[in-house]
Amino acid sequence: MDVNVTSSTVRGTTRAPPSKSYTHRALLAAGYSDGATVRSPLVSADTKATARAVTAFGGAVEPESGERFDDADALVVDGFDGRPAVPDDVIDCANSGTTMRLVTAAAALADGTTVLTGDESLRSRPQGPLLEALGDLGVRAESTRGNGQAPLVVSGPLAGGEVAIPGNVSSQYVTALLMAGAVTEEGVEIDLTTPLKSAPYVDITLELLDDFGIEATPVGDGGDALDGAAGAAGFVVDGGQSYAPAGGSYTVPGDFSSISYLVAAGAVAAEPGEPVRIEGAVPSAQGDSAIVEIVERMGADIEWDREAGVITVRRSELSGVEVDVGDTPDLLPTIAALGAVADGDTRIMNCEHVRYKETDRVSAMAEELEKLGAKTTEEPDTLTVHGSESDLRGASVDGRADHRIVMALAVAALVAEGTTTIRGGEHVDVSFPNFFDAMADLGIAVERDGAGE
């Protein structure tokens, strides 16, 4: 689907979509339980892949009140109580890397063989460190092509034990092992061989596990317990635990990765004197809430009422800043788009791991912003956007089949002279299905071609 975005101003109130990261974890945690309700879930292409996996393991995921699955305000999960059945068929994770990694560890608990695959993009993403870790724990876990990429074959059962794993490729490996380790006989002790990147995503996992009654602990070099994942040398989760949220239900918070595009839109294109208000911005463990501090450093007029969960942002003159995205990789596209509008240089550092997402997001943003007239410099671990040298004009750009690239380019298109055509607009369904509807409600001039095809 092509989406045409014409230079526009925005105003009004919108609501953040529920968190994709929390929804994935909550659906699987409910699957590990003997039953739980997930309230305010994000129902998207990615999270539906996790729901299908829970069903494949012998659970069931249904809307609470008989509404359409896509419109569900709550999903009732009939769990498999920590003992996943061997699936009758291959588990297709579609485009969801989170699903594949979390479900690969869950598959290791089954007393038999599970096969997992995904779309072309997912079949190119690295799974090798997780497969090696499961192998070290006594599970057969292999790539059918021998390259550490899907399709994957996993044969359990997993009893638990101690394992070493790198922390600089994907924090999802840690999340997968912690979630599965809680229901093993022996528990799992994880030693990190390299410093942990994207630590806030593990904090999300630790927070959610606690809400489901699971104790998991980050530890330092001396084995002492830490308050959070940052700086951890490893993690410990005891086995034999049971997943059970208080009151039998769990409520998903708003998604700060998605909020970042709404904040950026307000910062660069709010109608003079008219703010953009974003509801549902309740504080949580999400590292991507750093977007508020980042745009404030750039000079944005922004306020965050944490108690009410409301962010208010007005258009301002922005200046370039330096940002380390080691812990917040999903913010890189948003920051790059802001940098193309700001005065001076915006230097995005510590971003090599962002190259291993749905696409190489570093190169993708550099190349697509260049099409719009931005000037960029790309290095292996750094992306610099030269805002003062940029003159954004409408052009045809490629969303690279990546939801975050599509949404970031839509933000840049708000201030590009004329009309910008973004190819692959349908991919927003991965994390923010009503993104273009929400933007249209704020006043963006948007037309969709082929939406019904």
From Swiss-Prot:
Q: Where is this region: Disordered?
A: 1-21
Q: Which reaction does it catalyse?
A: 3-phosphoshikimate + phosphoenolpyruvate = 5-O-(1-carboxyvinyl)-3-phosphoshikimate + phosphate
Q: Lineage of the source organism?
A: Archaea, Methanobacteriati, Methanobacteriota, Stenosarchaea group, Halobacteria
Query: Which CDD domains does the UniProt entry name for this protein?
Result: EPSP_synthase
Q: Does the keyword Ion transport apply?
A: no
Give the protein name, as stated in the record: 3-phosphoshikimate 1-carboxyvinyltransferase
Where 3-phosphoshikimate binds, per the record, is at: 20-21, 25, 170-172, 198, 330, 357
Q: Which residues cross the membrane?
A: none
Q: Which UniProt keywords apply?
A: Amino-acid biosynthesis, Aromatic amino acid biosynthesis, Cytoplasm, Transferase
Under Pfam families, the record lists: EPSP_synthase
Its localization reads: Cytoplasm
The entry's active site is: 330
Q: Record the organism.
A: Halorubrum lacusprofundi (strain ATCC 49239 / DSM 5036 / JCM 8891 / ACAM 34)
Q: Which family does it belong to?
A: Belongs to the EPSP synthase family.
Q: What does this protein do?
A: Catalyzes the transfer of the enolpyruvyl moiety of phosphoenolpyruvate (PEP) to the 5-hydroxyl of shikimate-3-phosphate (S3P) to produce enolpyruvyl shikimate-3-phosphate and inorganic phosphate.
Annotated GO molecular function terms are:
3-phosphoshikimate 1-carboxyvinyltransferase activity
Q: How does it assemble?
A: Monomer.
What's the domain of life for this entry? Archaea
Q: Which amino acids does the record list as binding phosphoenolpyruvate?
A: 20, 97, 125, 172, 361, 404
Q: Which GO terms describe its cellular component?
A: cytoplasm
Q: What is its EC number?
A: 2.5.1.19
In which pathway is this protein known to take part? Metabolic intermediate biosynthesis; chorismate biosynthesis
Task: Give the UniProt record's GO annotations in the biological process aspect.
Answer: amino acid biosynthetic process; aromatic amino acid family biosynthetic process; chorismate biosynthetic process
Is the keyword Glycosyltransferase in the record? no
PROSITE patterns with a match to the protein in the record: EPSP_SYNTHASE_1 (PS00104), EPSP_SYNTHASE_2 (PS00885)
